[in-house]
C-alpha cells in the first residue's frame, strides 16, 4: 500500500544476551545502533529515551495479537478508555529503536518472534528504556512478549497490559 515503515535489523547474541545491535531505516537513511553497556546511537550520535512521566501524555505503539493467551481486544479497549495515544506501525523493530531515541515512549507486543525485537530492544535499553516480558521479568529474550518504555511510565504501562495476559 505504499506505507514506507520498515527496517533491517541485525544483532549479535552471546548465550542469552544480545551484545550488539543495528536497526536500519533505509527510507529515512537512519542507522540506530547499540553495544551492551555502551549506549545507543542514531547515525553515530548518542540518543536517549524520552523523559515522559505520564502514561496519558505518552506516545505508544503496539503489535496486535490473535493469540488466545493474550486478550488483545480487551487490553486495547482498556487502554483506549484511558485516552492513550496509541498506534500500530507494523514494524516493531523500528518502534523499539524509536523508544531508545525518544520518538516513542513505549511499545508492547505479544506473539512476537525474537528476531523481530532483539536488535530494537537493545537499542531501547541502551537509550535508557526499561525492557521486560508481560510478567515484569527483564529476561524477555526467551519469551514471545515484550514491554518497553521510559522508566517513569513503565509500571503504569505494564499494569495496564498484564491483566489480559494468561501466560
PLM regions and their residue ranges:
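Short strand-turn-strand beta-turns centered on an Asx-Gly dipeptide
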Residues: 15, 43-44
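DPxDG-like acidic metal-binding loop motif
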Residues: 1-38, 58
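Hydrophobic/proline-rich hinge and linker segments of small-molecule sensing/allosteric domains
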Residues: 39-43, 60-62
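Short beta-strand or tight-loop elements
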Residues: 4-6, 45, 82
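Short beta-strand segments in beta-sandwich/barrel cores
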Residues: 38-40, 129-130
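A short, polar/proline- and glycine-enriched secondary-structure boundary/capping micro-motif
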Residues: 31, 44-45, 51
Amino acid at each position: 500500500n505504499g506505507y514506507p515503515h520498515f527496517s533491517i535489523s541485525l544483532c549479535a547474541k552471546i548465550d542469552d544476551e544480545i551484545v550488539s545491535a543495528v536497526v536500519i531505516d533505509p527510507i529515512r537513511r537512519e542507522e540506530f545502533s547499540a553495544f551492551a553497556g555502551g549506549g545507543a546511537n542514531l547515525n553515530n550520535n548518542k540518543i536517549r529515551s524520552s523523559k515522559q512521566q505520564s502514561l496519558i501524555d505518552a506516545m505508544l505503539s503496539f503489535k496486535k495479537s490473535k493469540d488466545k493467551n493474550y486478550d488483545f481486544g480487551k487490553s486495547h479497549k482498556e487502554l483506549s478508555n484511558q485516552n492513550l495515544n496509541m498506534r500500530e506501525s507494523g514494524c516493531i523493530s523500528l518502534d523499539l529503536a524509536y523508544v531508545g531515541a525518544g520518538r516513542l515512549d513505549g511499545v508492547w507486543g505479544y506473539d512476537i518472534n525474537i528476531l523481530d525485537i532483539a536488535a530494537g530492544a537493545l537499542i531501547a535499553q541502551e537509550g535508557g528504556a526499561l525492557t521486560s516480558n508481560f510478567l515484569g521479568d527483564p529476561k524477555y529474550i526467551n519469551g514471545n512478549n515484550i514491554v518497553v518504555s521510559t522508566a517513569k511510565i513503565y509500571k503504569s504501562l505494564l499494569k495496564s497490559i498484564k491483566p489480559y495476559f494468561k501466560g
